[in-house]
Amino acid sequence: RGGQCVRLLQGRFDAETVYGNDPGVILGRYRDLGARYVHVVDLDGARDGSQGNRAAIARLARAFADTAIQVGGGVRSRKVAAELLGLGVQRIVIGSVAVTQPAEARQWLEEFGPDRIVLAFDVRLDAGGTPRLTTHGWESQTEASLWDAVLTYQPHGAMHVLCTDVARDGALSGPNLALYTEAVRRFPKIQWQASGGVSCGADLVALAATGAAAVISGRALLENRIPAAELVPFLPNA
């Protein structure tokens, strides 16, 4: 956000922690440990669609051409999607468009290919335990369920789905293992990316056991809560 490396607590822009002025330093640290993929979120873009961090993303893509970068936040038009992929970004993450403009998102899947598109569904559990979708930087909640959303895209070749339990994001409270276990059970052909709540190496082991293909961790890594010896075995795979 604003060119800095930051984390929000549960998607709240008034609960921001700054971890550094140069995201490249942090990305380099992960690359040197053996990370094949790095997940980057343009929080300004996620909030209002602005592209003020585009230059920073371009620098990361150039400087770390040997590391695949997936970028989300504010990818709300075909023009922005194509420009990001043109910068050397390996995958783009689409959230609000996937929820509110499914026809547009399906066109991107067909045009850019399912391996270049990650469908991001940020969820809050309702009183009955059903994961309901949120949009626009987690500030708007819908009545649509995660399961219905994935069903919409599966016939169109969707391959990668990133699911974040918003209530756990940045809280170091442990991931929602039941959510990802159920996601893999319902849609075993989807490459699920689990996000939210990771706090230690044991969480990575537990998430791997759910069948999730990848795990996204922010705060736990930025605060060095996962020792390198526990982290490195997972990096070549996700």
List the model feature ranges, each with a label:
Residues 1-16, 85, 89-169:
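Conserved anion-binding
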Residues 5-51:
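N-terminal beta-alpha supersecondary unit
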Residues 19-31, 76-82, 142-152, 204:
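Short, acidic/polar
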Residues 30, 38, 84, 119, ...:
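Conserved, mostly hydrophobic/aromatic
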Residues 37-56, 96, 163-173:
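Glycine-rich, proline-tolerant flexible connector loops at the mouths of alpha/beta enzymes
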Residues 51-58, 141-147, 173-181:
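Charged helix-capping and loop-helix junction motifs
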Residues 62-92, 103, 178-217:
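Catalytic cores of alpha/beta
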Residues 104-112, 204-238:
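C-terminal helical cap(s) of enzyme catalytic domains, especially alpha/beta-barrels
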